[in-house]
C-alpha cells in the first residue's frame, strides 16, 4: 500500500473521500492484480503478456472516459459499450479495480485508528479454530442456542445501498451501481439468485467485499442495540469505523419497533448472551429462558425485512436446547453433554467419594456429510465404499500417493479437534483404499493383487497413523503424553474450511 500511495495520490483523495478518480488510474489495477495484470484475469485469453495486459487496461480506461453512461439503457445490453467485446475479461478487470479502490479508505482508517493505540495483535486469532476454545469455555454453562442463517440479498442493489452508509463518494457509488446493472443485463434482464451466484463466482473478491459490508452493517446495528443497556461496554469486537447517520437510523429503528418492544434496553439486557459467526452462519447462545430467545428471533427477522429489505422467515432461525441438540458449525457437530467424574475427598480420618458431572462440549466429525463430499469428489460411492479416482490414473505412482496423502493430512489437520477419532479413521480408510484402487486400475490389476506385488514400504508414509509418530520419536513416552497427543488439538494456522469439509 505504501508503494502505491504516491502514484494514487491517496492523501489528496482522502481529504474529500474521493474514490472516483482512482478508477481511471492504471496503478489501481496494478495494485489489484499484484504487479502482474495477467495473473488470473487472462486465463481465458492465452497469448497475452504483461505489456498486452497493460494495453487492455489502457483501452478500457479510455473507453470509460469516452462513454456517457446516462445515455445507455437496459435495452442496449446486447451492444454493451461498457464491457466491450470481451465481457468476462473486462468485468474481471473492473471488479478487481472497484474492490481494491473501495478498500483503500477502510485501510487508511484502520491504520490511523491503530496509530498510538497500544493494541496487541494476536495473529493466531485469525484461525477459525480459535473459536472452539471460546465455545468450550462458554457454551457448557448456557442453556439455549439459536442457529441463524443470515439471509442472502436478493438484489445487488441492496449491497450497494449498504455500502453507501460508509462510502461518501457519490460518483464512485453511481459508477459502481451502473457497473452492476450492466453486468446483470448482460446475463438477464431480470436479476435472479442465479445471476448473483454467477457474479460471485466470477468476481469473488469484489462480491466478498460487498457481502462483508452487508454483514458488517447488520452486526453494527445488532451489537449497538445489544450493548446499549451497558453503555457500549463491549470493546473486544474490534475497531468501529466511521459510519454515517448511525444514531439517526438507530432512533428510527427504535420507533419502528416501539409497539412490539416498548423498552428496548430491557429487551436486550442479557449478560449471559454470546454470539459467534462464520460467513453467513451464526450462533446466538444464552443462559436465559426460551421466551427471550424467541424475542430475539422475532427481532432479527424484522431487522432483515424492515431495515435491509431482505426477505426472511422464522424458519431461518432455529432455537434448540444445547443439552439435547447438536450444533452444525464450521463443519463440526458440537454438543453439550454431562461428563461424570468421581472425586475422592479426604477430611481428617474420614474419606468419601463425590460424584461430579460438569457439562462438556463435544466436537465430532460429521461423518455422513463428509462421506457425501467424498462421493461427490468420486473417492467413494454414496454409501462410503471406496472407488478408484479415474482422473488421476494417468499420473505417476508417486504423484498419486502424494496427492491422496495431501488430502488425508489436510482433513486430519482440520479435524484434529474432534473428541472421537473413530469417524476420522473411517475417512482415512476410504482415502487409502481409494488410492490403492486407483493404482491397481492404472496397473490393470486388483487391489489385493497389487498390494501383494508391491513392497509395503512404498506405502509406509501413507499408512502410518499420526498417533504412531510419537511412539517412533519417543519409544518410552509416558501414557499421559500419548493420551495428550491423541486428545483434541486446535491449530492456529487454519484460516478457512477444508474444501471437502465445506458441505454447507
From Swiss-Prot:
Main location group: plastid
Domain of life (superkingdom): Eukaryota
Keywords attached to this entry: Chloroplast, mRNA processing, Plastid, RNA-binding, tRNA processing
Subcellular location: Plastid, Chloroplast
Pfam annotation, one family: MatK_N
A single GO molecular function term of this UniProt record: RNA binding
Family membership: Belongs to the intron maturase 2 family. MatK subfamily.
Job of this protein: Usually encoded in the trnK tRNA gene intron. Probably assists in splicing its own and other chloroplast group II introns.
Protein's UniProt name: Maturase K
Organism phylogeny: Eukaryota, Viridiplantae, Streptophyta, Embryophyta, Tracheophyta
Gene name, Swiss-Prot/TrEMBL: matK
